[in-house]
A protein has these predicted regions:
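Positively charged, solvent-exposed patches that mediate nucleic-acid binding
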Residues: 1-106
Length: 106
C-alpha cells in the first residue's frame, strides 16, 4: 500500500473514529468517513493488549495485503480505520479476508 493511501496522524484517526460511521462484526471494527480526496485511505490498528510489537505488525501486514488485493474494487473517496479484535487472532487468512470485505462493502 502506497503512503498516499494511508491515514497516519492521530488527529485524522480521532476525527474518523469520532465523527464517522462504525461497522462491527466479531473480528473487526471498521470506522469510515467520506473524504475530499479522489482515492480511499486506510488506517490499521491492532491493540497492545493483543500481543507484542512483532505480533501486532504481523497482523497489520496481513490486513494490508488483504486491502492491496482488493484495492481496485474500492473508489468511494472514503477514509477507513480498521481495528482488529481478539477473536480475529484465531481465524485463517481467508476467513479474515471474507469478514473484512463483508464489512467494507456494506
Amino acid at each position: 500500500m502506497r503512503k498516499l493511501y494511508v491515514v497516519k496522524t492521530t488527529r485524522e484517526f480521532n476525527d474518523i473514529i469520532n465523527s464517522g460511521v462504525c461497522r462491527k462484526n466479531s473480528y473487526f471494527v471498521v470506522h469510515l468517513k467520506k473524504n475530499h480526496l479522489k482515492y480511499d485511505r486506510f488506517g490499521i490498528s491492532v491493540s497492545k493488549k493483543l500481543g507484542n510489537a512483532v505480533f501486532r505488525n504481523f497482523y497489520k501486514r496481513k490486513i494490508r495485503s488483504m486491502i492491496d488485493n482488493y484495492k481496485k474494487d474500492f473508489n468511494n473517496q472514503t477514509d477507513y480505520i480498521i481495528i482488529l479484535r481478539k477473536a480475529g487472532l484465531s481465524k485463517s487468512h481467508e476467513e479474515l479476508e471474507k469478514e473484512l470485505f463483508s464489512l467494507l462493502k456494506k
